[in-house]
Amino acid sequence: MSVNLSVHDLIAYTDWERKTWQSWLQQQGSAVLKIGAGQNGDGRFESVGELMRHIFSAERRYVDRLSGRPLTDASSVPSDDIEGLFQFGRESRKDLTELVKTLPDKDWDVPVEFKLMNSIVRMTPRKVVVHTLMHEIRHWAQIATVVRLNGYKGEFHDFLFSPVLGGEIRREEARG
């Protein structure tokens, strides 16, 4: 049996996830963005805000690579400004959805070559776009863990609770 999950489903899920995070962060305040990423990190991202900027800048840069554009420098996007981060995220998402909408069907499975850090990689746009979305999902899960470990109660972010692919969640009344 084949079950199809499209890139559009993953985009819809990550759009929902971003809205959920933005709403939660606005309620908590920008201090959450300064929470440290932990002592065992690799040193690239020192705070929740820096990890969020990385989510959005990675998306933008993968679109840049697939579009043959110069790589976006995201260093000027402040990592301590909720609205600024999500505005950058809206811009990167607009570019990704435009790429998905306009990339010809015949090009989705044709490998492209580009530089990634200190390597030259050769991958299909399909793989790069799926990776970009899974990369985001993975990092939001890391952020959820970090904020929980720092005493914040978060929202449910599981795909199951999202509106994507339908379904319904009804909470039962607690019985005393």
Question: Which ranges hold each PLM region?
Answer:
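Helix-adjacent hinge/juxtasegments
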Residues: 68-108
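Carboxylate-rich helix-loop segments that flank metal/cofactor sites and access channels
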Residues: 105-118
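Short, contiguous pre-domain boundary segments
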Residues: 2-3
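Short, contiguous alpha-helical
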Residues: 8-27, 32-75, 117-176
